[in-house]
């Protein structure tokens, strides 16, 4: 993938108890170098599919015997349905376009309720029929409140509420109604180390702290990870406790442009996060932008570091993969990591995991 495509993906353009811990002080470069030296790199296996479909397979969601993969650059449809775990193609939906019911820029999909997000239009769509032998059908079309500013990721708190990172910088999260799209409330603060910068340039800070989010299956914790910094945050929905984990690569680094935009200036860090009943799984890169630019067309997008953490933020295991991946799905019962390699022609890859 070329660097101009990278930039398109990067910029489609206080609580009761708080704790911040500096847990992992080893840089991402050192982690990868050590794994290579010891011969401890986890080797992946390509999962073949029977049709040439993907251009930029970015997110994978699995529910029961079906999987949906979001492809950001597909010419016709954003979402593709497969059987799971054998990945037999079934159907596609989420037509790319500017017409009614079409999507300009798809951002994510969540199986609970079968909702998808179109940041380009500021809308959410709910589908039925996402299964083998069926044709997906759009059932609801919700226009999101304009006060949400930008909507680049989301997760569902319950059947009536969606959480979206707050890109205005006023808060960390926005909560909206799934029936009306109305903004219900905002919560938390961006935990930037320079509060004065947040006061002066809140939207730029929010862009520099662009985050991916994931609820635990029981909805008791909400986890966010930063795209441009080594920062993981865990928010308890019941106790309002907040745990912040700052890794060895530091918090997001960015520059404020004359126009007020937050331009990343440090590293590309987290690519995806998945929370299960037991663990938090994240895929991490850590390369510096200045080094990425030197690679030019040889640059491969994605992260090679899989971190497995407890719900309290303690890292219990770190894997180094043999290739970078952008999106992840961990099947704990099968002991398998499925990753999406956007640099290859065959983009679904699986890795064996040893989970306790």
Where do the PLM segments sit?
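Structural signature of eukaryotic scaffold interfaces centered on beta-propeller domains
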Residues: 58-62, 107-110, 152-158, 205-218, ...
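Blade-loop segments of beta-propeller domains
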Residues: 88-115, 120, 142, 322-325
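Conserved blade-ending motifs and adjacent loop-strand segments that build the rim/top face
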Residues: 250-258, 312-330
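Short, conserved, GDST-rich strand-edge loop motifs in beta-rich repeat architectures
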Residues: 282-300, 348-351
């Amino acid at each position: 993938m070329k660097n101009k495509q990278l930039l398109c993906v990067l910029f489609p353009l206080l609580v009761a108890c708080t704790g911040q811990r500096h847990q992992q002080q080893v840089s991402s470069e050192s982690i990868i170098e050590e794994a290579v030296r010891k011969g401890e790199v986890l080797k992946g296996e390509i999962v073949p599919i029977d049709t040439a479909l993907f251009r930029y397979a970015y997110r994978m969601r699995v529910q029961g015997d079906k999987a949906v993969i979001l492809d950001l650059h597909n010419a016709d449809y954003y979402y593709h349905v497969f059987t799971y775990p054998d990945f037999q193609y079934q159907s596609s939906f989420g037509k790319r376009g500017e017409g009614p019911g079409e999507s300009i820029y798809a951002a994510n999909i969540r199986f609970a309720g079968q909702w998808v997000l179109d940041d380009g239009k500021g809308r959410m769509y709910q589908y039925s029929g996402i299964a083998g032998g069926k044709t997906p059908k759009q059932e609801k079309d919700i226009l999101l409140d304009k006060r949400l500013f930008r909507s680049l990721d989301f997760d569902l708190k319950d059947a009536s509420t969606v959480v979206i990172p707050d890109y205005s910088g006023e808060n960390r999260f926005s909560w909206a109604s799934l029936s009306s799209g109305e903004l219900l409330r905002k919560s938390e603060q961006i935990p930037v180390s320079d509060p004065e910068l947040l006061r002066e340039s809140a939207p730029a800070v929010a862009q520099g702290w662009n985050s991916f989010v994931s609820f635990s299956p029981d909805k008791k914790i909400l986890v966010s990870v930063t795209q441009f910094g080594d920062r993981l945050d865990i928010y308890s929905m019941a106790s309002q406790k907040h745990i912040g984990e700052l890794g060895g690569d530091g918090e997001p680094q960015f520059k404020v442009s004359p126009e007020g935009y937050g331009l990343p200036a440090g590293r590309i860090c987290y690519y995806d996060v998945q929370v299960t009943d037991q663990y938090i799984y994240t895929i991490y890169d850590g390369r510096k932008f200045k080094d990425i630019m030197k690679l030019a067309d040889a640059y491969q997008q994605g992260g090679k570091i899989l971190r497995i953490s407890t719900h309290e933020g303690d890292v219990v295991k770190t894997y180094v993969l043999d290739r970078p991946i952008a999106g992840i799905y961990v099947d704990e019962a099968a002991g398998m990591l499925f990753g999406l390699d956007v640099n290859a022609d065959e983009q679904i890859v699986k890795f064996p995991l040893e989970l306790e």
